[in-house]
């Protein structure tokens, strides 16, 4: 049985694209034949070229950084969130339901909110999302 190959790339957005993890995601996703990187959020660097922040990515064709407020949620299939823990949950609650999210922080790593608050020493504000 042959696998059906999707000719349309998966539209990827990264939130938190100006840190180390964001840079690695940009590098890896831009090389993947099934992915198209179309938005990279870095609020403090919005409007700047990714290649100006990460010179080692100069050879890649990349979008400029945008702010979270500039995100077009109609133009995304999957979001990678590369923000620090406790920052991630503040942003993820603002993303429309139905969009797939891979969060690389600790915010949704543990099943029970009590465990998160005990381990990380901060309140978890996204209780409804934790249940998903």
Task: Locate predicted features.
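N-terminal Rossmann-like NAD(P) cofactor-binding subdomain of oxidoreductases
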Residues: 1-132
